[in-house]
Amino acid sequence: MLTNEYLKRVYDGLAKRNANEPEFLQAVREVLESIQPVVEKHPEYEKAALIERLVEPERIISFRVPWVDDQGKVQVNRGYRVQFNSAIGPYKGGLRFHPSVNQGILKFLGFEQTFKNSLTTLPMGGGKGGSDFDPHGKSDMEVMRFCQSFMTELYRHIGQFVDCPAGDIGVGGREVGYLFGQYKRLTNSFQGGMLTGKGLTFGGSLARTEATGYGLCYFTAEALKCMRNDSLQGKTVVISGSGNVAIYACEKATQMGAKVVTMSDSNGYVYDPNGIDLAYVKDLKEVRRGRIKEYAETHAGATYVADCTQVWTVPCDIALPCATQNEINKESAEALVKGGCTVVCEGANMPSTPEAIEVYLSNGILYGPAKASNAGGVATSGLEMSQNSERLSWTFEEVDAKLKGIMEGIFHASYDASVAAGSEGNLMVGANCAGFLKVATAMMAQGITY
């Protein structure tokens, strides 16, 4: 609840101006509620209108993306880049190609990205972009033509010292390759650090593909060790999603001794009491691009439920939501509690509604918020940029070790900040306060024109 008059005034004004952007308002309110103890200790923030500046993107770029489909028909989509905050480094955040993309969702993601990047300790600001283009069902040539058209406008707004995009939902290695190739052609320069998630043959980093899922498990393991004197060993884990984050969270959780029993897609979820056959899921999703229901057709004992929202009714010790925003509501959270869940760490961006988070906290669930627990992807993007700058390529083990250290550091920074804020163990409050303080200090140092 917002009790600070300054923060309440800022939020009310923002809500009036952005009434049609519920995801953005949800993200802002969560942060403002968390940072109240910090703001009350710094009256200079109000004088400098720091919060008013923090919640407004520095720049929003919107543009048309015309492209020609395989039938020779001209299609037009809308492209965006939200350059939210560059106080601690060049804008950094993914590109999302999905029909649901709109300005409000990208503002929410860019706002969250600002604090997530701050938590990594790497010099990266916050941004997000994308298009309402849907790559599913499109041929490789159609995807290539779209990516080239998208970059033909975006290239003038980005660069390794300005704004460094990456992949996200709908933007994988194929799309990143097409985008990078067009940028290189338009600028006649090879700026490896201007786009991350690249292929290994042209500046990509080992362990980048695995990073978000692996990082989620490293964060979860460190939280369990320090807050519960426990580990992932022997735990039953429910995972939503079957994309990059879910697949590699499943892989690392299994390596750490857990048993993952579910994965899902937008149509439904599969439950395998014997543990998910990850090799099959990788082939299904990364090679054949099939639907998760095919898993149950080939695995004895596995069952498929044609409602992805019901995955949270499966009994478990740990839940790792890795699909999309607001996938867990109050009822889903209550189902997790009823099923014996004691830990929820987020792999997707803001997958829990505020009401769900209240259920977690009121029932003593160890809750790892997305901006902390899923920061592994952008952290390793930062490591990819470092390798590009040094003209070096680190081994998988080197990158993985750095990732593990960063994720453990994020946990400790969040925990310590929760103590300082008077909310010991509330990692949501801690992550918001820790991420905010670094950005706020930089903004104050750079003057009110910032």
Name each model feature, range by range.
Residues 2-27, 223-224, 337-450:
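Adenosine-phosphate binding glycine-rich loop
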Residues 44-73:
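Structured beta-strand/loop patches that form or line metal/cofactor-binding pockets in enzymes
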Residues 98, 117-233:
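Glycine/serine-rich phosphate-binding loop and adjoining beta1-alpha1 elements at the start
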Residues 199, 204-313:
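Glycine-rich phosphate/diphosphate-binding loop of Rossmann-like nucleotide-binding domains
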